[in-house]
């Protein structure tokens, strides 16, 4: 449809939701006690995540995950 806008949220929100949604290791399936996120080859901390305020939509988020 022309004019259809996809809902955009800050990248930081997607990252926080992803981080808090993970309960098991994707490789060995061991339950996680703690985890670190790696984005574009770099470990990112809370401060770095907070600064990632670019608005993205679900389609962009899907591409970033792969």
From Swiss-Prot:
Q: Could you name the domain of life of the organism this protein comes from?
A: Bacteria
> What is the protein's known function?
May regulate sigma factor activity.
Q: Report the protein name in the record.
A: Protein FliZ
**Organismal lineage:** Bacteria, Pseudomonadati, Pseudomonadota, Gammaproteobacteria, Enterobacterales
Gene name of this polypeptide: fliZ
């Amino acid at each position: 449809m022309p004019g259809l806008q996809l809902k955009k949220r800050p990248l930081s929100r997607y990252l926080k939701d992803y981080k808090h949604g993970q309960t098991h290791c994707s490789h060995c399936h061991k339950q996680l006690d703690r985890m670190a996120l790696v984005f574009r080859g770099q470990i990112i901390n809370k401060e770095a995540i907070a600064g990632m305020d670019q608005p993205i939509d679900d389609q962009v988020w899907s591409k970033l995950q792969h």
